[in-house]
Amino acid sequence: MEQVDQAVAKLQLLEEMPIEVSFLETVKGRLIQNGIDRLEALGVTDILVIPLFVSSGSTHIDEISYALGVKAAPDKETDLEPFRLKARVYFGSPLDDGEDVARMVWDKVRPLSVDPAREVILLVGHGSAHNGFLQRWEQGISSLARTVQNVSGIITDHALLNPEGVHDKAAYWNQERGHDVIVAPLFLSSGYFTSHMIPKRLQGLDYRYSGDPILPHPLLTSWMDRQIRELLQSMKTQARTDNN
């Protein structure tokens, strides 16, 4: 939470506008509905939403976009009720891939690299058991792996915790191909998955792993700034269409 607040505080917006950092659950007074209420109380009529999630395959993005009225129905059943909302919503994209994200990942694992020609970076993501969402996870993480490889100059592959593919992929690169495996967790913050689940899946294998998540990283502010500019352009394009 603090890391996201710090990244947002560094934004230098071209236009003055109020900003709310909201969370899906557990943070009292800072839930999504709280943020909407505070913005609309200021007279806001258009809200730019930046979903701070690693992948388009997250079911949370699906349910949040539905609850914000961006889509008529969720792709997966949800308990999340539609929010009280009068403003028009412009919904951005999660991290997924792209050079900023690749550089964040590379910066986190760069200290573990000793001999790039003999190494492979293995991106490890959460994944999904749900059809449709798994395909989005695969599409995003495979694209990110290619970009990380371009940025780092090190062979980069990927695996998901769900369905389990981490152990076999790491074993393949280490035992069959003779590469040193550097594991990069695709998680925004430290927690159960980075400290417990990933090491458990890799038990018995040789690998390098710091457990460092993607955040904090200064490039998150750059990524958010780009999202805001793109959403503002969409908003202005829509306004011109409405006025014609």
Where are these regions (language model features)?
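Extended amphipathic ligand-handling, pore-lining, and cofactor/metal-binding catalytic surfaces
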Residues: M1-N244
